[in-house]
């Protein structure tokens, strides 16, 4: 079941109604499979809905990457999921300590790391070659490129402007830009429109990639810029510098290769690009 398939409209009302429809489907799924444990990950709205349905259907819940900060409404959802979960799988010591401060019994908390990094660290990624991926995106094989991922953030009124600022800063430096359209959150349609309005020369737009091909893109990019959590997690794991714009990932533990800009403008984005490279 994919939440994107059930989206009524990518705005606040449509998104909320879609979550309601999802809630109606989950009890039947749980009744069909009768799991011993419902394993949930992260802070997505659909994960929160699944935790509510599982809790009130009397299923045991384990929560991956519990206790982290997200910097926007998903962070609130993460902590709400934590209150319904029975086992908390924290990715780092900071998250573990936060769970304790939130009142969770320490014997239920396990520091397990971020599982999405395991295949990267262990070298188990099998993807198409970067040249094959570049051809699919119509990128010159010799051209250096920057990966751009911008998701909606309900707490930031100017987030749509980050797209134009990022494009202009990279254009001035002559980088080919690979933009990945945002997830299905409320407000995503506005960001998608801004991305699709960008000039198409020296730029490629993709809906999504397989995880393996996405990791291969990260390994071969010059830089990642935007507000996706992959700039905090996967990018440092492959040695890629990243620039996080706005507050979406504010407060999370970050590697030294992550540059945080809380109030983006053309000048400080350009300065961060220079420092990254």
Task: Locate predicted features.
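Short acidic-hydrophobic, aromatic-tinged amphipathic segments that line or gate anion-handling sites
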Residues: 90, 110-112, 204-208, 259-264
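A donor-sugar binding/catalytic signature common to diverse glycosyltransferases
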Residues: 39-41, 48, 88, 211-253
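A nucleotide-sugar donor-handling region in carbohydrate enzymes
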Residues: 9-10, 85-159
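Active-site and donor-binding regions of nucleotide-sugar-utilizing enzymes
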Residues: 7-106
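Short, small-residue-biased leader/transition segments that mark boundaries at the very start
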Residues: 1-3
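Short acidic active-site motifs
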Residues: 76, 213-214, 268
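Donor-nucleotide binding loops and adjacent catalytic segments primarily
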Residues: 13, 128-220
